């Protein structure tokens, strides 16, 4: 038996029974002459050895559904997570960051470890013209022959999913690209019943996905009702300021309720076209709005304001973003 420090605590363990993937035992980790890479491998191996059950990790987007899920955990209606992760793109509206700061205090009060991860500021990164690689945004494209298209989306993976998965690996003790057949973690997603099409299989065999709101058949509106009934402040909409997936309803909300964010989106719409032109790698012209005109020139009036009668009521099918960024 040997005393080994795992997660800051002294534990007595038979180190010869904790094999590393290389075939060495954990006892070898405490010998001399190790490289930095071997040190990291040993640290992560010790972390995995200390786990008694898979970690429960809440993917927090700070929007309506994931916020409601967090509050339900606080109220004891859903099993609490071991960790909470928020992927910060650096380009959320100010009210979202203010809301996130309040959630951080709630998590502190209830001893929920919180991790804010980031791959950088997406707005600044995609405007670079120094020849370095930049992620593609799912902008609407006007082709030279005046046909329409849509650019491939890379922003979600690079600024949302990858940073979160990197933190997942760190928490369960896996190196980059390291595989495991063990169930090491479960990611809990705040996806509501009306967004059931967003359910996905986990990308790795050591990971499971859980969708409590879908299991309980709770819709987005029911989340808002739950927050109101329990005395919680209604969460803001969480999405990058210049996300092209916004509906006209959401662009109107941004313009009418967050004028600074709207002005930022309008500026970015012009700046992004200029950056793409300078880089010279695309023959098509990008736009944030599906109309293929600058955002500040788009007619965002409702059907009623346009004098167009809708059988199902005003903009019945244009009320909510489906949040298809995947988080």
Task: Annotate each language-model stretch with its function.
Residues 10, 19, 25-26:
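Intrinsically disordered, low-complexity segments enriched in serine/proline and basic residues
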Residues 16-17, 320:
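Positively charged N-terminal leader segments that act as targeting/secretion signals
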């Amino acid at each position: 038996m040997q005393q080994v420090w795992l997660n800051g605590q002294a534990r007595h363990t038979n180190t010869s029974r904790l094999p590393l993937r290389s075939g060495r035992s954990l006892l070898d980790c405490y010998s001399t002459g190790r490289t930095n890479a071997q040190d990291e491998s040993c640290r992560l191996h010790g972390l995995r050895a200390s786990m008694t059950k898979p970690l429960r990790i809440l993917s927090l987007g700070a929007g309506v559904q994931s916020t409601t899920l967090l509050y339900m955990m606080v109220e004891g209606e859903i099993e609490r997570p071991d960790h909470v992760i928020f992927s910060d793109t650096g380009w959320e509206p100010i009210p979202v960051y203010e809301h996130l700061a309040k959630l951080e205090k709630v998590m502190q009060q209830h001893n929920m470890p919180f991790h804010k991860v980031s791959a950088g500021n997406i707005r600044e990164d995609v405007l670079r013209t120094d020849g370095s690689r930049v992620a593609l945004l799912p902008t609407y494209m006007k082709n030279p022959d005046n046909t329409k298209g849509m650019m491939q989306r890379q922003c979600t993976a690079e600024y949302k999913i990858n940073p979160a998965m990197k933190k997942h690996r760190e928490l369960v003790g896996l190196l980059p690209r390291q595989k495991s057949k063990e169930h090491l973690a479960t990611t809990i997603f705040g996806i509501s019943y009306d967004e059931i099409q967003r359910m996905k299989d986990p990308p790795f065999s050591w990971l499971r996905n859980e969708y409590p709101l879908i299991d309980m058949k709770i819709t987005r509106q029911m989340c808002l009702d739950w927050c109101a009934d329990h005395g919680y402040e209604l969460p803001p909409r969480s999405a990058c300021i210049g996300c092209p997936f916004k509906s006209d309803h959401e662009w109107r909300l941004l313009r009418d309720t967050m004028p600074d964010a709207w002005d930022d989106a309008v500026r970015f719409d012009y700046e992004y076209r200029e950056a793409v032109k300078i880089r010279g790698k695309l023959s098509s012209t990008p736009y944030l709005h599906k109309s293929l005109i600058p955002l500040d020139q788009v007619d965002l009036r409702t059907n009623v304001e346009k004098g167009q009668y809708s059988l199902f009521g005003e903009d019945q099918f244009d009320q909510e973003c489906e949040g298809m960024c995947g988080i």
